[in-house]
Amino acid sequence: EELSYQNISIMSKVLSELYKYQRNFVITCIDELLEKVERGLEINDFTHSMHRVAEVRYLTELYSFALIKPNVLLDTMYLILKYGHNGKGSYLFSPNDIDEADNYFKIQLLSTMLLNLRRNTSMLSKKLPLFLRFYEYYTFTKEQPLPQETQFSLQTTFQKYEDEDGFERSS
């Protein structure tokens, strides 16, 4: 709770070293973090936005230190993306009370996660392009034009995956 954003990677390193000696403690920490991420989606209070960004960054750092499996990370990313949408109707991401068309915070959360991914596994390499396409589709369902900060974040995120994996954005 009281950790500076700049020290998140250091805390992740400490937790990865602690895993050798206190597995149950580390697993409990990870489980609580996953619950906080989900609870943040349920509450959706903008006053906690920085905490939520820090939580997803911490989760990504834990993945980078191999404390979280790729499927857990991807499941969490899909949870963030799809939260509040039941998948029924003519559009997968129809605006609703939980995820309004002019709310771009989920884009910020997911960009934070994608930009901080440092470890690439074969499973992640196979499944990430589909997620990126799904994420891109989600951004198209938001009120356009996107705010400049959001556009910059998306451009940086997709540029990373164009350079690394050859991902090509839709027009």
Protein language model features and the residues they cover:
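Alpha-helical interaction scaffolds
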Residues: 1-171
